[in-house]
A protein has these predicted regions:
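A short, flexible low-complexity segment enriched in Lys/Arg and Gly/Pro that occurs
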Residues: 4-9, 70, 143-144, 196-198
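A general structural motif
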Residues: 22, 53-55, 85-87, 162, ...
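A short acidic-Thr-Gly-centered motif at the start of a beta-strand
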Residues: 13-21, 50, 79-82, 157-160, ...
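Residue-level marker for buried hydrophobic side chains located in beta-strands
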Residues: 25-27, 58-60, 90-91, 165, ...
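Acidic, His/Gly-enriched loop-helix segments that form or flank divalent-metal centers
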Residues: 104, 110, 114-220, 224-230, ...
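Short glycine- and acidic-rich boundary segments immediately preceding or forming the N-terminal edge
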Residues: 1-39
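Long hydrophobic alpha-helices with heptad-repeat/coiled-coil character
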Residues: 54, 59, 69, 74, ...
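Core catalytic region of metal-dependent phosphoesterases/phosphodiesterases
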Residues: 28, 33-113
Length: 250
């Protein structure tokens, strides 16, 4: 599928690093437009964090767009002030990358519409996109707020802190940020991290599993929210034994 979305230059994105581990980190799996589920899960996280002193970090692991029609409302929410006591960071997933490519060249990257993009555009009131590149771009410019575009274009690829690497799909745990490849971070196979020898751990989404899973080198938290109704988060704390999980599962 990735080969369908190479019709514009690579988008240069940041890779973030924190020198100090916060009091707690909460990471959220692939939301895919399910703003309703994210609101519920964020409330759980805020309630849990109320008893934890010190700064907290809330990381969304990418793929916040596509497949459901709550995308516009979700991005509005993410542009609002962070919850008290939290720093909220959204990483780029392959679906945000596809959307940005479409916005730059809608005719050349029209395949995005078949991978959930149509639902994203519907959330902005666009239910039919056709015409020349200039015509389509005009419709997109009218419908999608510039702050939403800027938000999507500015999403970082990854974040590292302590012994953890957070990325949408894959992060080579044996290599530094400077040796990572954007394509792998967005589209790679997370299972490749199982072979790492560095003693770090990848926290990722991208691949749907029935339940969140813990493996020696990685924690997987994409539980297919758009089709299962289950959105999952993991909490990590220094000195805490096992990670704690939260979800919208009834």
């Amino acid at each position: 599928m990735i080969g369908l979305f190479r019709k514009r230059k690579t988008i240069r994105r940041r890779m973030l690093h924190l020198n100090t581990m916060p009091a707690a980190i909460y990471a959220v799996g692939d939301i895919h437009g399910r703003f309703d589920l994210y609101e519920r899960l964020e409330r759980q996280i805020i309630q849990d964090a109320a008893s934890i002193e010190g700064p907290k970090l809330l990381i969304l692991l990418g793929d916040i767009v596509d497949r459901s029609t709550g995308v516009s409302g979700l991005i509005d929410h993410l542009l609002a002030p962070d919850p008290e006591g939290f720093k909220r960071i959204t990483l780029c997933g392959n679906h945000e990358d596809m959307m940005c490519r479409f916005l730059g060249d809608p005719v050349g990257n029209r395949a995005w519409l078949d991978y959930g993009g149509a639902e994203t555009l519907a959330s902005y009131g666009l239910h039919h996109v056709a015409g020349t590149t200039d015509t389509v771009k005009q419709h997109l410019t009218t419908a999608i707020p510039p702050e939403h575009r800027d938000f999507l274009m500015g999403l970082p690829l990854s974040l590292t802190v302590g012994g953890y690497a957070f990325a949408h799909a894959f992060y080579d745990l044996d290599k530094p940020d400077t040796a990572q490849h954007a394509t792998s971070l967005l589209w790679g196979d997370p299972a490749r991290a199982d072979r790492a020898a560095a003693g770090r751990r990848l926290i990722h989404g991208h691949v749907i599993e029935g339940n969140a899973s813990i493996r020696p080198n990685r924690i997987s938290i994409d539980t297919g929210a758009y089709r299962t109704g289950v959105l999952t988060a993991v909490r990590l704390r220094t000195g805490e034994g096992a990670p704690a999980f939260f979800s919208t599962k009834p």
